[in-house]
Swiss-Prot record:
Location, primary (coarse class): other
Species per Swiss-Prot/TrEMBL record: Thiobacillus denitrificans (strain ATCC 25259 / T1)
GO cellular component, one term: bacterial-type flagellum basal body
Localization (cell): Bacterial flagellum basal body
Alphabetical GO biological process terms: bacterial-type flagellum-dependent cell motility; regulation of bacterial-type flagellum-dependent cell motility by regulation of motor speed
Name of the protein: Flagellar brake protein YcgR
Xref: InterPro entries: PilZ_domain, Split_barrel_FMN-bd, T3SS_YcgR, T3SS_YcgR_PilZN
Length: 255
């Protein structure tokens, strides 16, 4: 699965000026990025503006001649209908630690290799942004990395087991089945234990920055939380950085 959408910390500069420096307008460069996503079979998030749901999809084809991109269709008519309603959606993906995003234009249904698919126009501009704190590496689904979170509710002593979707030096995305941790932006989750393989347990506070309901292929939903580290101790940060580097090195060696 793909990671949650990156939160761009604009600091003291104007957001429009900041993003303008990372916006591609060259058609050739935009097509190159889209084809890289297709070739690498990168999972893509389509963030629906109105319902705040996320569709997980992938790029199936890039057609330069008719100026279209073909995406895997959503699982469910309601989500497909919302996409085609013109209410707005954002295309977000991560390629080698670089965030690639653009606003989606008109969406239509089509067929690709005799299966239902979605067709969108090739964007006229595309944001390509990498900053150290936004660099995330996806974690394997087959052997999920656990994060144990004490319940944020005072009356509960429950230890909630979650699975990490991706991880970086600035934060993590995790799945919360049953929405037991809440989704309020700014909520602090204290005493979280990241059970990283082949390294010491990382203990930290996580701050919820964003949340989304993810529709799985079997039709069920799960809550995905994008969180940042708060006051991560230096020794824990060192363990974390080594882990991220090892995961990324192993991923590159498999390419």
């Amino acid at each position: 699965m793909s990671s949650s959408p990156p939160q761009h910390d604009l600091g003291h500069c104007d957001g429009d000026d900041f993003l303008a420096r990372y916006t591609l307008h060259s058609r050739a460069e935009i097509l190159f990025q889209l084809r890289a996503l297709q070739k690498r079979k990168v999972l893509v998030n389509l963030d629906l503006s109105e319902s705040r749901q996320i569709i997980v999809t992938s790029v199936l084809a890039v057609n330069e001649a008719d100026n279209t991109v073909v995406l895997d269709s959503a699982r469910g008519d309601a989500l497909n209908n919302e996409l085609m309603s013109g209410k707005g959606a954002e295309f977000v993906a991560q390629l080698d630690g670089v965030s690639i995003s653009f606003s989606i234009g008109a969406v239509s249904l089509c067929e690709y290799e005799k299966l239902p698919a979605l067709r969108i126009p090739v964007p006229t501009s595309l944001i390509r942004l990498q900053r150290r704190e936004h660099f995330r590496v996806p974690l394997p689904i087959a052997n999920p990395v656990k994060c144990i979170v004490p319940s944020p509710w005072e009356e509960s002593k429950e230890q909630i087991t979650t699975h990490l979707v991706d991880i970086g030096c600035g934060g993590v995305a995790l799945t919360d089945i049953g929405a037991r941790l809440g989704t309020e932006s700014g909520r602090l989750l204290r005493g979280c234990r990241l059970l990283l393989p082949e390294t010491d347990v990382v203990v930290t506070t996580l701050e919820i920055r964003n949340s989304a309901q993810i529709r799985l292929q079997n039709g069920s939903f799960q809550t995905r939380l994008g969180c940042k580290f708060v006051d991560l101790p230096n020794d824990m940060a060192a363990h974390l950085q080594r882990f991220v580097m090892n995961i990324e090195r192993a991923r590159r060696n498999r390419l």
